[in-house]
Amino acid sequence: FMDVLARVSDFLDHLDRTSGPALVFAHGGVLVAAQVYAGKVKLEDAMKALPPYGGMVEIDLPLPRLHPLMLAGTGSDVGKSVLAAALCRIFLQDGYHPAPFKAQNMALNSYATPEGLEIGRAQAVQAEAAGVPCHTDMNPLLLKPTSDQTAQVVLSGKPIGNRSAYEYFRTEGREELRREVNQAFDRLSARYNPVVMEGAGSISEINLKDTDLVNLPMARHAHADVILVADIDRGGVFASAYGSVALQTPEDRKRIKGIIVNKFRGDLRLFESGVKMMEEICGIPVLGVIPYYHDIYIEEEDSVELSLKQRKAVQGKVNVAVVLLRHLSNFTDFNMLEHDERVNLYYTNNVDDLMKADIILLPGSKSTIDDLYELRRNGVAQAILQARRNGATVMGICGGYQMMGQRIADPDGVEGSISQMPGLG
């Protein structure tokens, strides 16, 4: 018995104890079962605590180390985030210890980690799917647009200042950011198996390849296999998939191991020939065709999704109008209302549609004074006040709540050149 114990102890020295291998073995009709938890319980102590039983020999080995996997896209809003969350949950169900990663996010819908730091909401959802707490290493770089040409840069969960697009993409500090995101990935990879990575937008923006931090250059650093996600619902799926593959370097093209056709509507049999054609022209296998889903409610982070939302009042429901600001922030605040059957939630800056609302919501803004100026210029501010006099309820969140006051002041010019402006109150 002790000879077997010695051999098993030697064997365990070669295992990754963080995976907590379950061990069951027998010798001379004696069965001993033990669970080793990251070295917290010694094998000898665990064996002494268990009664002997007769039985068969079985050793449950740790799961193999997997390559990191990146979901890259033919464009924005093709479904990368949802598929990454799905894979995180599938790996968890299969006994692995996965974690999500996206090197750089551009979104106004952020999420606070347990430490009070900011990451993109998609990675927070993916972390929940993976069964792990969210951390800034999962999204080390977050860009929060403040205007058409500038954004607040959030590094490791903390704002480090505003940058213009040119400054951000073309300055020497870019390589420092690359080191930061690479180190964040390395820390995750040392703790989790596998890391499920997400690219950003399209992988075919060849004019930005030398400064790209999030797509194929990140996959190269991670030695990741890449799956290309193509959206068939918006049309042009063959051109977008083929173009995305063809525009890559030979080295990067080899990383793309498969294609997923997402958001398919109709009878899949009608696309069977399409699968074969795509495999022929791209030279890459199609791993699957995913139906268009209507019942998966995961908070969006991409403003592309906002453009698809309802825009008009309807009869027979409580009409709740969200004022469509140019720099609207955290539109996911209203998702629960969107799924309430009693409510028609719509986004608009049309004066006539605002006047039909029972409730008007002023949302958060990344540039509050600039958005308030625009509301006054286009007549929306006057329409909100008139709707309030007509009996509508007006509520504000964050920057929208500030707009409801008597005056907004920005003496230090944090958001722009306008130092103060009268509010709606």
Language-model regions: role of each:
Residues 1-8:
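Phosphate-handling substructures
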Residues 1, 127, 266-269, 406-425:
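Pocket-forming structural segment of enzyme catalytic cores
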Residues 33-37, 86-90, 406:
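Active-site signature of alpha/beta-hydrolase-fold catalytic machinery across serine-
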Residues 27, 360-364, 384-407, 424:
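Catalytic nucleophile loop
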Residues 19-25, 56, 68-70, 194-196:
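Residue-level preference for the first positions of well-ordered beta-strands
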Residues 2, 39-63:
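Domain-level recognition of soluble alpha/beta enzyme cores
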Residues 66-386, 393, 413:
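Flexible phosphate-sensing "switch/lid" loops adjacent to ATP/NTP-binding sites
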Residues 8, 25-29, 199-201:
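Short, well-ordered beta-to-alpha junction loops that form the rim of enzyme active sites
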